[in-house]
């Protein structure tokens, strides 16, 4: 009976020790107030070659400007400046993330394989 209690205690202790280190890997969604204009966007992507995890990034949102009654400035392309600004921010984010998420290898010059090359004769 005492042996069963000891084995159950050791099993529970082993499970507790295994669960505790992995609980820190779970992502928790923090709450942010809309008055700050910041929202935390959780991105969970892993590039296996570089072994990097991008856990989170801050993204500015213009929720306070969307409800205003001001007229939007329109450029010659027909898009408002706010839309163009959002598009340019998205492009910058993609460029910044490309170095972590890309699977591109450095370019290198390939040599022709050496087949049937005559071996130098030793004297």
Curated annotation (Swiss-Prot):
The modification Sulfotyrosine is found at residue 105. Residues 61-78 have a biased composition (Polar residues). GO terms for biological process: cell differentiation; regulation of asymmetric cell division; regulation of lateral root development; regulation of root meristem growth; regulation of root morphogenesis. The modification Hydroxyproline is found at residue 113. Residues 1-29 form the signal peptide. One of its GO terms (molecular function) is growth factor activity. Disruption phenotype: Altered PIN2 traffic. GO terms for cellular component: extracellular region. Keywords: Differentiation, Growth factor, Hydroxylation, Secreted, Signal, Sulfation. Expressed in roots, shoots, flowers and stamens. Residues 61-92 are annotated as: Disordered. 'Golven' means irregular waves in Dutch. This is Protein GOLVEN 6. It comes from Arabidopsis thaliana.
């Amino acid at each position: 009976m005492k042996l069963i209690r000891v084995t159950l205690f050791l099993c529970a202790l082993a499970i507790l020790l295994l669960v505790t280190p992995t609980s820190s890997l779970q992502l928790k969604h923090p709450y942010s107030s809309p008055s700050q204009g910041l929202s935390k966007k959780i991105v969970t992507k892993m590039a296996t070659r570089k072994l990097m995890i991008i856990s989170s990034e801050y993204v500015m949102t213009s929720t306070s400007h969307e409800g205003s009654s001001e007229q939007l400035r329109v450029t010659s392309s027909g898009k408002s400046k706010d839309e163009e600004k959002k598009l340019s921010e998205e492009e910058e984010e993609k460029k910044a993330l490309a170095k972590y998420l890309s699977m591109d290898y450095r370019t290198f010059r390939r040599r022709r394989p050496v087949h049937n090359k005559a071996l130098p004769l030793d004297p």
